[in-house]
From Swiss-Prot:
Lineage: Bacteria, Pseudomonadati, Pseudomonadota, Gammaproteobacteria, Alteromonadales
Keyword DNA repair annotated: no
SUPFAM superfamilies: Translation proteins SH3-like domain
Family named by the database record: Belongs to the bacterial ribosomal protein bL19 family.
Transmembrane segments: none
Organism field: Idiomarina loihiensis (strain ATCC BAA-735 / DSM 15497 / L2-TR)
The protein's name in its UniProt record: Large ribosomal subunit protein bL19
Job description of the protein: This protein is located at the 30S-50S ribosomal subunit interface and may play a role in the structure and function of the aminoacyl-tRNA binding site.
GO terms of biological process kind: translation
Record key words, sorted: Ribonucleoprotein, Ribosomal protein
Molecular function terms from GO: structural constituent of ribosome
Length: 119
């Protein structure tokens, strides 16, 4: 019985997953368009920054984007397959040697730069 219910849950999760997502990795600069509801109207808000973390868990996948706004570091975590995430666009590929770029939190200016991946 457990295997049957697991397969049903897996089928339902795969049905809800988005198929049109670009491949991105930590170090990439992305623009995430998020649906924001203000009162009775809905608009798109763009959030551009460096991906510092990717969590691959099927339907529960998430990624964290960091940007510096007015001298203040802002991090936002998005659920990859959320209906609130309208689109993800990769602007620049970054060459990094780590899966989690938490060290960028302590850095600013030139030391926080990421080399561009040459491919």
């Amino acid at each position: 019985m457990a295997k049957v219910s697991q397969s049903i849950i897996k089928a339902l999760e795969e049905e809800q997953m988005k198929q049109d997502l670009p491949e991105f990795a930590p170090g990439d600069t992305v623009v995430v368009n998020v649906k924001v509801k203000e009162g009775n109207r809905e608009r798109l808000q763009a959030f551009e920054g460096v991906v510092i973390r990717v969590r691959n868990r099927g339907l529960h996948s998430a990624f964290t984007v960091r940007k510096v706004s007015n001298g203040e570091g802002v991090e936002r975590t998005f659920q990859t397959h959320s209906p609130l995430v309208d689109s993800i666009k990769v602007k620049r590929r970054g060459a990094v040697r780590r899966a989690k770029l938490y060290y960028l939190r302590e850095r600013s200016g030139k030391s926080a730069r990421i080399r561009e991946k040459l491919s």
